[in-house]
């Protein structure tokens, strides 16, 4: 089998990035054909462009226009991006709540969504979307739940739902856009075609440990209770493994075709 070059972006604020980075590296290392380079943001555009696939776990990372164009062109050129949890989040803390500014349209249109809010962390149920029940990414996955951040987002372009939950109501005063009155599916996992390539987005994966809230403006010296998120669920790891396999498919298909 061919060598497969992955670029892993793990960085940002208010999450246990070290934990997520380690867990994702362990999963990537299960395949001896995969070689990984790691960054905290999108600044190493040369390494990103040279990779076979991209995987990310970030929160409130703000790429430049040039960096956004590089990741857009990376996917549009036929490659795949497995984006996790807060990759689609940028935040601005103001007196009336946390705003999610629409200042990064290229990034959000490439990802297919932008995070806007989440209710308080508590368990929520997740099911495979009926139209996707035979898709290899989710086939055979039984209904499950996780105690995590239930993402409320706006969407861009073509979206292929894979997994969903439901939420209606007020997500809480912490976020400026907190009124979500429509009782409709909230996507937990979806595919988003971009040119010749595709993005797979999977929203669970919150994790917070002792020192993760020290970043301003929150500046909490020590967080009192660890928040473990979906990482405690075997189903979460099963889906991560499937997502990584999905991301490798174009490279392996090209090698097989000679």
Which residues does each predicted region cover?
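Oxidoreductase and adenylate-handling cofactor-binding alpha/beta cores
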Residues: 107, 111-113, 143-159, 195, ...
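Helical hinge/lid and interdomain linker segments adjacent to catalytic or ligand-binding clefts
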Residues: 3-93
């Amino acid at each position: 089998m061919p060598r497969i070059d992955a670029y892993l972006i793990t960085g940002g604020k208010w999450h246990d990035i070290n934990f997520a980075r380690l867990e994702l590296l362990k999963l990537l290392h299960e395949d001896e054909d995969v070689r990984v380079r790691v960054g905290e943001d999108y600044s190493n555009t040369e390494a990103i462009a040279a990779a076979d696939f991209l995987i990310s776990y970030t929160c409130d990372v703000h790429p430049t226009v040039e960096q956004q164009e590089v990741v857009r062109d990376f996917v549009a050129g036929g490659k795949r991006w497995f984006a996790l949890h807060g990759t689609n989040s940028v935040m601005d803390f103001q007196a009336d709540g946390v705003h999610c500014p629409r200042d990064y349209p290229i990034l959000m249109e490439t990802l297919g969504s932008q995070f806007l809010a989440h209710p308080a962390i508590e368990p929520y149920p997740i099911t495979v979307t009926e139209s996707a029940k035979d898709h290899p990414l989710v086939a055979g996955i039984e209904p499950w739940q996780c105690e995590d951040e239930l993402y409320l987002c706006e969407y861009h372009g073509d979206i292929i739902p894979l997994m969903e939950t439901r939420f209606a109501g007020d997500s809480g005063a912490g976020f400026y856009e907190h009124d979500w009155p429509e009782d409709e599916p909230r996507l937990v996992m979806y595919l988003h075609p971009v040119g010749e390539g595709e993005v797979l987005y999977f929203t669970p994966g919150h994790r917070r440990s002792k020192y993760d809230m020290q970043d301003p403006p929150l500046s909490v010296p020590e967080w009192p209770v660890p928040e473990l998120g979906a990482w405690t669920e075997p189903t979460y790891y099963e889906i991560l493994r499937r997502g990584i396999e999905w991301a490798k498919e174009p490279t392996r298909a090209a090698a097989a075709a000679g």
